[in-house]
């Protein structure tokens, strides 16, 4: 009976042009002499259609790979089943272009005869005898492939019609069974038809498996092997390479000395740079003596004012935003700086700073009270400042009422303490505190002023004074004092500036 062969796994050889098909028998039609296979494989590759049908004339060789046991035929489903000829009889079948064709039934003992295939080349038929010993044959490639697919549903190989036709140009298109759009439905089932129960219950433990890997032991084994072989591509550990980089020291460096500056008197306050170098503070008397000795050796007041103005203007330009604020695209947003200067050398330093700021396209407003007699240094600086686009005012009413970008304070001088009692001084302090703009003090004094201007930044010259909290964050600028000048006043000095002229200091 035909039902006895349903569910059997067979291998059908259709010649060189059509190739070899393998699959499970789903239907045998004795009238039309056709046989149908489900889940077919063509030359080891799974077909895109769920079922193919073969004519007897197209079959060159038929092998039974596995015969199902009792009860296995029930898994085939409700299929169209007809009787099969006697066992031991082989059939020669063929597939036409539309999947149907005339059936020619021949016994296994019949002689070979060529069969004509419509629109195909002639295929030489061969006789196949089915022996009972073939029932105990081992599992074919089809079973092994089907089992691997069922064990690992996460890995699926997809093939399109282009790849199949490019590998086998003479391959006939198998018959598509099912309803309309059945092929798309089968593709969807193949991609999304996995049961959720077959997914692994636990995720892969990456950390646990990584902990099992003893990297030190593996590296030691590799190192031992490379030592024995006498060659090593990455260099032997604990051995100095033959060549050095251009920035690598060959000689061992000496221990770093962070205290390179020492002063002759006891230090009341110490600062340190970003690199850790200690910078001690000096008293006002020692600082004044240092400037006097430097002036005697050629560092005149004019040169000191110029150097102070350059360093202070560089710091002010950085505080104003640097290149992000001062560029051709922001010409309409020029920063505004208010300079508060007194009639002394400290004020002359502020005027020099304002001149350099005005040269860098900064809107500068200089406040300097009117005096009958001015210092020569102030007169010279005012003469240069008047050649810029800066504005000079002598009344606080001419200062802007709106907040400015920066206020530079040069009002205080230890040698002119009486100026703090002047009305203009008190009014200038009140204006600076009400303007709410950040304040930069240039060379501020040491004393604590009860009603002075609280600075956010302070710039010291050469060596810092023991400034208090009112000075804000302290910066130090290099005004060009030679090292031997420091030694002449009893200071063992080594420059802490490095590649800069203005460096920040931190309280030690």
From Swiss-Prot:
Keywords: Cytoplasm, Phosphoprotein, RNA-binding. One of its GO terms (biological process) is deadenylation-independent decapping of nuclear-transcribed mRNA. Residues 192-228 form the DFDF domain. GO terms for cellular component: P-body. Transmembrane segments: none annotated. One of its GO terms (molecular function) is mRNA binding. Residues 1-79 are annotated as: Required for P-body targeting and interaction with DCP1A. SMART domains: FDF, LSM14. Gene3D superfamilies: 2.30.30.100, YjeF N-terminal domain. The modification Phosphoserine is found at residues 131, 138, 140, 161. Pfam families: Edc3_linker, FDF, LSM14, YjeF_N. Residues 1-68 form the Sm domain. Residues 98-194 are annotated as: Disordered. InterPro entries: DFDF, FDF_dom, Lsm14-like_N, Lsm16_N, Sm, YjeF_N_dom, YjeF_N_dom_sf. Binds single-stranded RNA. Involved in the process of mRNA degradation and in the positive regulation of mRNA decapping. Belongs to the EDC3 family. The DFDF domain is unstructured by itself. It assumes a helical fold upon interaction with DDX6. PANTHER family: ENHANCER OF MRNA-DECAPPING PROTEIN 3. This is Enhancer of mRNA-decapping protein 3. It comes from Mus musculus (Mouse). The gene is Edc3.
């Amino acid at each position: 009976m035909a039902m006895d062969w349903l569910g059997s796994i067979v291998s059908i050889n259709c010649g060189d042009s059509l190739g070899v098909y393998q699959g499970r028998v789903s239907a045998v039609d004795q009238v039309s002499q056709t046989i149908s296979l489900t889940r077919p494989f063509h030359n080891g590759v799974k077909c895109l259609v769920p079922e193919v049908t073969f004519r007897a004339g197209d079959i060159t060789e038929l092998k039974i790979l596995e015969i199902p046991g009792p009860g296995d035929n029930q898994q085939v489903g409700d299929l169209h089943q007809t009787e099969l000829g006697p066992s031991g009889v082989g059939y020669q079948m063929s597939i036409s272009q539309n999947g149907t064709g005339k059936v020619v039934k021949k016994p296994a003992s019949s002689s070979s005869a060529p069969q004509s295939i419509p629109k195909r080349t002639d295929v030489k038929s061969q006789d196949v005898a089915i022996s009972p010993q073939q029932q105990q044959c081992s599992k074919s490639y089809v079973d092994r492939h089907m089992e691997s697919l069922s064990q690992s549903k996460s890995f699926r190989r997809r093939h399109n019609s282009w790849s199949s036709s490019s590998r086998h140009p003479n391959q006939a298109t198998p018959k598509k069974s099912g309803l309309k759009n059945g092929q798309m439905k089968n593709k969807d089932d193949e991609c999304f038809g996995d049961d959720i129960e077959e997914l692994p219950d636990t995720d892969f433990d990456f950390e646990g498996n990584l902990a099992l890997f003893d990297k030190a032991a593996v590296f030691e084994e590799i190192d031992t092997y490379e030592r024995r072989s006498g060659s090593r591509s990455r260099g032997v550990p604990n051995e100095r390479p033959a060549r050095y980089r251009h920035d690598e020291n060959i000689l061992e460096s000496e221990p770093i000395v962070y205290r390179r500056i020492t002063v002759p008197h006891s230090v009341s306050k110490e600062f340190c740079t970003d690199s850790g170098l200690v910078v001690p503070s000096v008293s006002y008397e020692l600082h004044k003596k240092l400037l006097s000795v430097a002036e005697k050796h050629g560092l005149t007041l004019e040169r000191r004012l110029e150097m102070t103005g350059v360093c202070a203007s560089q710091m002010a330009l950085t505080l104003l935003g640097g290149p992000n604020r001062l560029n051709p695209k922001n010409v309409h947003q020029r920063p505004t700086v208010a300079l508060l200067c007194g009639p002394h050398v400290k004020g002359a330093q502020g005027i020099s700073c304002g001149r350099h700021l005005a040269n860098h396209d900064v809107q500068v407003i200089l406040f300097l009270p009117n005096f009958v007699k001015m210092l020569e240094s102030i007169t010279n600086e005012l003469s240069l400042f008047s050649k810029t686009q800066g504005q000079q005012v002598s009344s606080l009413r001419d200062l802007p009422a709106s907040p400015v970008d920066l206020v530079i304070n040069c009002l205080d001088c230890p040698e002119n303490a009486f100026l703090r009692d002047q009305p203009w001084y008190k009014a200038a302090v009140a204006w600076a505190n009400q303007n709410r703009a950040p304040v930069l003090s240039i060379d501020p004094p040491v004393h604590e002023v009860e009603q002075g201007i609280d600075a956010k930044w302070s710039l010291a010259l050469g060596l810092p004074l023991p400034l208090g909290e009112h000075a804000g964050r302290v910066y130090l600028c290099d005004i060009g004092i030679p090292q031997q000048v420091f030694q002449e006043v009893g200071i063992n000095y080594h420059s802490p500036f490095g590649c800069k002229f203005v460096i920040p200091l931190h309280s030690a």
